[in-house]
Amino acid sequence: MNAKPAKELLLQLGQCSPQDTGQWTGAYKLPPELFEYYREVGPDDIYIEIGAETCTIPSLAKLENQQVGYRVHPRTTERFSNWPGHWIVVASIEASPMIYCDGAVFYAKARKGEWMLNKLFDNIYFMAASLATIGLFFRKWVEVFDENYNLKSEHCEQLTNDLTELFDSKAKAELVVANLGF
């Protein structure tokens, strides 16, 4: 997966524009791949409705703010000792972060205690394209949840099929669907 299909999918849900390194406000160095992603895809603070939750994909200018509560304490801005320096939150679904780490993107369900990461995407472009695909799925379908607010089986199957097309792998699609709680 590269920038072009990821950007095309995101553009159906929000705005994208090239963003340069000068828009990064953080005190630490970002990996070159993230600058490339923001230059080529350039999500402009995209909010994606995923069922009852909202996924946030920040612009480069707001990426540092996305680290608050994970990397640093929200009031004191003191660095959390249990958050490795090479983890960068590049998106979130409510309070659950998508973490860029060594080229891949991991998902960690928000909870107390140690972070338990699950690798969901081989690169940030797959993450962007997948989140857009999921957002487009929820935009297309109504009444997708049962009375217990679980995704109905036929819709879960459709979402898995949509992601299978993207990944060219049903196993990867099922992994994403399961980890995101569908």
Task: For each feature predicted by the language model, list its residue ranges.
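Charged, low-complexity surface segments at secondary-structure and domain boundaries
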Residues: 15-24, 111-115, 141-148, 161
